[in-house]
Amino acid sequence: MGLHKLRLAAAVPVTFSSRLFLKPFTNTLTLGLFSRHLQPRNKPLLVRAFSASAAVQDIPATQTSDSSVAARPLWKAAIDFKWIRDNKEAVEINIRNRNSNANLEAVLQLYENMVNLQKEVERLREERNNVAKKMKGKLEPSERERLVEEGKNLKESLVTLEEDLVKLKDELQHVAQSIPNMTHPDVPVGGEDSSAIRQEVGSPREFSFPIKDHLQLGKDLDLIDFDSAAEVSGSKFFYLKNEAVLLEMALLNWTLSQVMKKGYTPLTTPEIVRSSIVEKCGFQPRGDNTQVYSIDGTDQCLIGTAEIPVGGIHMDSILLESALPLKYIAFSHCFRTEAGAAGAATKGLYRVHQFSKAEMFVICQPEDSESFHQELIQIEEDLFTSLGLHFKTLDMATADLGAPAYRKFDIEAWMPGLGRFGEISSASNCTDYQSRRLGIRYRPSEPPQTGPKKGKANLPATKFVHTLNATACAVPRMMVCLLENYQQEDGSVVIPEPLRPFMGGIELIKPKHK
């Protein structure tokens, strides 16, 4: 059985350096099984003008044009272009507030071109049908010959315009998919510093002795081995040892047990998914600063969060209203390139390439998504309060929202070793942004039958569901919090009481004596 060579696509800084490399690189780095490569950005498709009408206009100058042709999209989002056109000002402000690079003018111009071209196609189809009808009657030979020639010309023109229409629709999708979700009206406008505190729980622990960070604690207690992992896998990988392994399992099992009590169905997920699923969930699997590892030579990626495979479970489906809400708590390993991450604030377990996480995911009716968002946040806050953490919940500002999020709350916990708060979870309401891309709809309960005949035509129209996601437990950062906050003067670490039954009754991680 041959060994497949994986080349993991991830944008890296040009100034990247590592002890593994002796000279600068350009496009591709090969690390035995793994490598990272830079993807060229797709150039906009040149829309071919048609001579039968002036419906197709030039794309705005902000759209770069060259001789390259954008690849046809492998999937299409059900974007409401008419709504975008009718609410241009609101969409424009939203794009600006979120610091998005979406090109609204290009989208609107392409949409207008498409509408005009569709009208022209429909006009030619009607003319061709009229010619066909005339051909059925009794005609003089000369008239029949003229109609045959006219029908032939119309067919050729129609084929050309239909090809143009397909290309125009593809380019419209290509450009429009960069438009972010709209934003909740209560979200603060600005950068991360503009985020509003929803609440703050507890207070920083006061230590009467010099404190250690989790790296030193992990070394002294023989819990974490970064050096061996760096030799085996590279930087930002780690081994957990001894009680740290039990602590990870305890965190996950306790979290799952608590969240399941709220009616969430437990899942484990695939950790390799198709790139299209990553894109449909609102992540960029390739390009500058991607956080996604792509498997070269395939259409697959390693997941950065269980949100992605869980979102794909009901892809291209119509759910019954009675089946909603669907609430999941999913365990997975997560893989992130952490491109651009550096500095003391990201050292140790705080920012790593591979980690375990439990993720909550909700599929619901649109009118229920805000209440489920509050439920997710409350579950997170209850979990962290039970573990005795000092944390604050932030309503994140517009510029800190990812493309799918309508609103996002982050929770930051106090990390004594860092001397600051660090993010440990987030909860996002993505409304119908993901469902329009994943094709997840539901059919409202059928109203009383009033017509004489019951049939498909009488069924209520389907609607797009809303999706939400929230972190229940990101293991490495939770371990940072617990090790640093529960350290004792003698070098030991106390295990929070809720976790002890899941660690065989262990109450204390003690220094190892050689």
Swiss-Prot record:
Q: What is its EC number?
A: 6.1.1.11
The record's keywords, sorted A to Z, are:
Aminoacyl-tRNA synthetase, ATP-binding, Chloroplast, Ligase, Mitochondrion, Nucleotide-binding, Plastid, Protein biosynthesis, Transit peptide
**EC top class named in words:** ligase
An example Gene Ontology CC term for this record: cytosol
What pathway is this protein said to act in by its record?
Aminoacyl-tRNA biosynthesis; selenocysteinyl-tRNA(Sec) biosynthesis; L-seryl-tRNA(Sec) from L-serine and tRNA(Sec): step 1/1
Q: Null phenotype? A: Lethal. In heterozygous plants, aborted ovules.
Per UniProt, subcellular location reads as: Plastid, Chloroplast; Mitochondrion
Q: Which family does it belong to?
A: Belongs to the class-II aminoacyl-tRNA synthetase family.
Q: What is recorded about the domains? A: Consists of two distinct domains, a catalytic core and a N-terminal extension that is involved in tRNA binding.
Q: What does this protein do?
A: Catalyzes the attachment of serine to tRNA(Ser). Is also able to aminoacylate tRNA(Sec) with serine, to form the misacylated tRNA L-seryl-tRNA(Sec), which will be further converted into selenocysteinyl-tRNA(Sec).
Query: What is the protein name for this chain?
Result: Serine--tRNA ligase, chloroplastic/mitochondrial
This chain's source organism reads: Arabidopsis thaliana
